[in-house]
């Protein structure tokens, strides 16, 4: 994948053209890394809710949630991964929207939007959160703290503490830390409670 990334000339072109990344996502989906995130999401959002998988890639999380009784829409840039997702939906006889973010933004009104292992790929983390907040009544997102041994520059270093403070300034429903460096938050957009901010100030939300 390193050769493909270098040849593409950077992040934007890489994610829109990479076929190797499709296989990387497939292996990652099989690892079970995101299962705790899905458990937290489904713990707070009941089956039947309309969810948005933002930065969906091959759509493995959304397909799991459809099987669990949720209505799921998908959003990402048009690329080999989303074309594979469309094929997976057809093979299952499922009719679910797949929004091309180069052409349109998903509508507001979803019950929840989630983005797992996505925000570290975008140039503007807070702008990305604003996009999520415009789509749904609840946001579920994780913030990765990078390790020194990242093989290639696929991930951007995130201001994790500031992102956690942003979530705490909203109506924070849940915070969890997984795998040592993945900070998961579930919150509702809008001005938050003093309790959420006090929890952060007291050190109960640590990065």
What are these regions (language model features)?
Residues 118:
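Hydrophobic adenine-recognition pocket in adenosine-nucleotide-binding enzymes
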């Amino acid at each position: 994948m390193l050769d493909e990334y270098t040849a593409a000339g950077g992040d934007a072109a890489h994610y829109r053209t990479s076929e190797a990344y499709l296989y990387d996502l497939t292996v990652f989906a099989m690892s079970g890394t995101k299962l705790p995130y899905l458990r937290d999401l489904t713990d707070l959002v009941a089956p039947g809710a309309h969810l948005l998988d933002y930065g969906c890639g091959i759509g493995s999380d959304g397909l799991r949630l459809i099987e669990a009784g949720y209505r799921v829409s998908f959003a990402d840039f048009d690329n080999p991964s989303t074309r594979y997702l469309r094929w997976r939906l057809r093979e299952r006889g499922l009719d679910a929207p797949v929004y091309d973010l180069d052409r349109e933004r998903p509508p507001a009104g979803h019950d929840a939007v989630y983005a797992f292992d996505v925000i570290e790929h975008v140039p503007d983390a807070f702008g990305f959160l604003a996009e999520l907040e415009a789509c749904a009544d609840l946001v579920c997102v994780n913030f990765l703290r990078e390790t020194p041994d990242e093989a290639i520059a696929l991930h951007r270093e995130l201001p994790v503490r500031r992102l956690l403070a942003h979530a705490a300034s909203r109506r924070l429903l849940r915070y969890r830390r997984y795998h040592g460096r993945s900070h998961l938050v579930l919150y509702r957009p809008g001005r938050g409670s003093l309790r959420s901010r006090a929890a952060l100030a007291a050190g109960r939300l640590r990065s």
